[in-house]
Amino acid sequence: PQAGDPLARRRHAFLDAQLTAARTRLRMLQGERLSFADEARGLYAAVPEIRPLSDYDPILARIEALVPGQGPLAVRVDAFQERFAIPTDRQDAVMRAAIAECRRRTVAHIPMPEGESFVLEFVTGRSWSGYNWYQGNYRSLIQVNTDLPVRLGRAVGLGCHEGYPGHHAYNALLEQKLAGGRGWVEFQVY
């Protein structure tokens, strides 16, 4: 990388990390078993702090005192959250409103490329809660898996994570600033 260009140095580090992740994934596909920490380090350059489960007991005790009802905590938390379930016939409108609000708050701080947009789709039979399929040209397909409960908090969480300032915004800006602005073609591979 060029000594005077910090962005070029970051590009070099990014590409190096991508190669490390690809090598790690190839090792896994070839049957090598990695510890959780080694997998996280190889794929994400992250070192997770693995703590004994008992470290979480004080936090669980605080939650236990806050969540109403009787019985196991997990059942009570689920019953509490179910009070915020979005009826099926309202999910589209609520998701669109949540994403619109996430976008409004994002563009107040981060200008988005002109013409950026997304298509919202509800799907089943997936292993994930929500997904952003970046299509290029500042467009995304945002999918929401309705096999899982669609609750109010999830609508906002997915709106932020998959949309704004999440994957859609991130990829549109990468395409605009790095692929288009600098000619860095690796940011056109999705």
Each model region followed by its residue ranges:
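N-terminal maturation segment of proteins
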Residues: 1-190
